[in-house]
Every structure is written in C-alpha cells, then in structure tokens.
Amino acid sequence: YSYDIVKDVPESHVITQVPHKSPAVQEMNPFVQQDRFSSVALDSQLNPIYTFENYCESKSNKLAFTIANAIVRHPEKQTFNPMFIFGPTGVGKTHLIQAIGIGMKEENPDLRVLYLSARTFESQYTTAVRNNKVNDFINFYQSIDMLIMDDVQEFAGKTATQNTFFHIFNHLHNKQRHLILSCDCPPSELDGMEPRLLSRFTWGMTVELSSPDYELRRNVFLKKALQAGVEIPEDIVDYVAENVKDNVREIEGVFVSLMAHSTALNLPLTVDLARNVLSNSVKMSRCQVTFGVFV
C-alpha cells in the first residue's frame, strides 16, 4: 500500500516552524500538535478479508490468536503492548495482525488504526527527509491510536529510520496506544537493529506463529472450499494436508490450482488430480512432496 502523508493531510493541518520567538505568537507543545490530525479522515489500509472469522485456529497458533482477541476485547489493558508476532513466511502473521485492526475498528469506528509494512514506513520517511517534512511525518504517526506494522526486520541497517520509529514508539506507548508488530524472527535474532529499539520490542508480548500443524492445514483447505461453495472429498483434503506442511499460502494456492484444473479441463476432483497439481506446484523429492517457503 502507498500512503502519502503530505497529500493526505489538509494544508490547514500542516505544522509550520516559527523562525523567531514573538510576544504575539504562542509556541505549541509538539505533543499537542499531533492532536490536530485527529480530525483528518484516515484510510486504515486494512484488507477486509483478514478477519478473525476467516482465521483458522489450531494448537499451532492458539496462543497468538487468543492474545489478539484479548487486545480487541480489552484495549484498555497494556499487558500485551506491544504485541510482537514472529514466524516464517506464509504462516498467517499478516492475517492475524490485520484482524486485530479490523476488530478494533468494528468496536470503535472512530479509532485511528493504521496498517503498513516497515518498508512503506521507511520509504515515507525517506520522502519526508527529502521534502523537509520530518516534523509532519512524526506528528502524523504520533496521532495514530493503533499502529500495526508488518515485517519490522526491514528496518535492519537503517539507523535513521530506526531512530525516528524509536521516538514514535515511545510516544505511542506512553500514551497507552497499541503497537502490533510482525517479524520473520524473534527480537533476539534481529541483526542490524538499535539495542534500545530491540528492547522495546520485548516490552509486551512476544509470540511465535509456527508452521501449521496437520489440523490447521486441513482447516485452511476446508475453509477455502467452504468459501468457494465447493465440496471436497475427504481423501483429497487429507492428501493435501499431509503433503503441504509448512506454508498456509501454499495450501490456499493448491486449492485454487486444483479448482482451476478441474473446471478448465472438466475433470472430477480426485486424489490423482490433486497429486498432479501438487507435482506442478511444489518440489517433488524421493516420491514425496516437499517445498520451500516462497516469498
């Protein structure tokens, strides 16, 4: 998603600097200035598909799912702030963190919730520096009620961006506003990050989303079928769940491919068809289906 802070904030809200003190001009507290953004309409950048209702729960993600729901039910509590979710690609991190945002908006539509990736944040910051709009950039983010950031590992090695996010993080946390973060590894394994920022990542709740277990793999495949209004034979569900083991996205992709083959070629849904689809979708090794994590 792209989000142009300067364009999306009316000119009347732009914070200007007064070069010299004057008896006729009262200086404003910068932490009060950010409240002027609260009247600006904000697109939360949340994907409406990523809800709690569409999220498949199992033992492998139960802790993260339970905490995510608790944040929405009891936003006044700061026990899990920030919530830091980590895990490999394709295990449902983006879905879960956006579900928190959607749940919060459903409970309080006026809440200023924003989802974005760390890479988008870094790009916006670079643009703000180039255009001499860093104050506007910081004040905008300090006006957010819940900040949801994906892939914070993208901050690695970007010291200036980290320092800016550090100050935004401190302000939001001090104001008891929630921060939801995702990463591909735990804070202890993050390289190229400022120690003071890393320490703040662990202030609240750090929880892992591991590779999906068998129950979750079956549930994901069945939910895709239910959403499509298709009845899938149990032996096909079992075959896919047994052979696509590490990545929820791959399971969803297999379902789409299976339905495309069945529809386009007018073929019945069988294990043989599923085997053929998997052989073209994932790597075959020693007569067993395996695959790597796709980005």
Protein language model regions, located:
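Short glycine-rich substrate-engagement loop in P-loop NTPases that contacts/grips substrate
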Residues: 105, 109-146, 159
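Short conserved motifs of the RecA-like P-loop NTPase core
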Residues: 231-243
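Conserved ATPase-coupling elements of RecA-like P-loop NTPase cores
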Residues: 153-166, 190-193
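Loop/turn-to-beta-strand initiation segments
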Residues: 111-112, 143-146, 175-181, 205
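Short regulatory helix/loop adjacent to the ATP-binding pocket of P-loop NTPases
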Residues: 126-130, 187-203
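Intrinsically disordered, low-complexity basic tails and flexible linkers associated
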Residues: 1-114, 119, 178, 184, ...
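Sensor-1/coupling segment of RecA-like P-loop NTPase cores
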Residues: 167-168, 172-194
